[in-house]
Amino acid sequence: NNNAVSEEIADALHDASDHLPVYMDVWFDDITYSDQGIVISEIMANPGSVSDSYGEWFEIVNTTDSTIDLQGWSIKDLDGDEHELYSDQASILISPDEYFVLAKNNDQSLNGGVEVDYVYEGYSLSNSDDEVILLDASGSVVDEVHYSNGWPFSSGVSMEIHDPLIDNALIGSWFSSTSSYGNGDMG
């Protein structure tokens, strides 16, 4: 009994297949996406000059013409790491065309020399296979990057996109960073 697709589609799949029978379960997660204009633009998952616990960071950029308040937004991955952006001040603002660095540590003498706009806790970047998922205050996905081995980063080298308006979900959109900063990492 087929309740998932129309009989016409089931018949077409049946007729097209040389490996009968064909059974398939398809489901879609209840995910809401939001076009807020904030893009993940650079990721330092594996710092070389300091430990991961001090030197991990990622960068976002506001591609809109409006200032956006990040208060109440969240970062997470699929392994359960999650952090809600919060400030004792009323807002966490990112101006139009502004780049904004989120990191585990803002002490430049400990984090490899990167200038940080916001410090997070409870969230880590794997050195080989992970996700950076950015959600707005309502829980809608604003942007996400799923990276793995083969993406253009290595120990001490972040990966970046050169154009924040291209699809940053594609490996071909990312490049190894070539600018040295702080203690010698590239980012």
List where the protein language model places each region.
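Surface beta-loop-beta hairpin patches that serve as ligand-binding interfaces in beta-rich domains
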Residues: D11-W27, L170-G187
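Activation on beta-sandwich/Ig-like modules and their edge loops
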Residues: D29-I171, N183-G184
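Metal-dependent phosphoester-hydrolase catalytic domains
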Residues: N1-T32, V132, E144-Y147
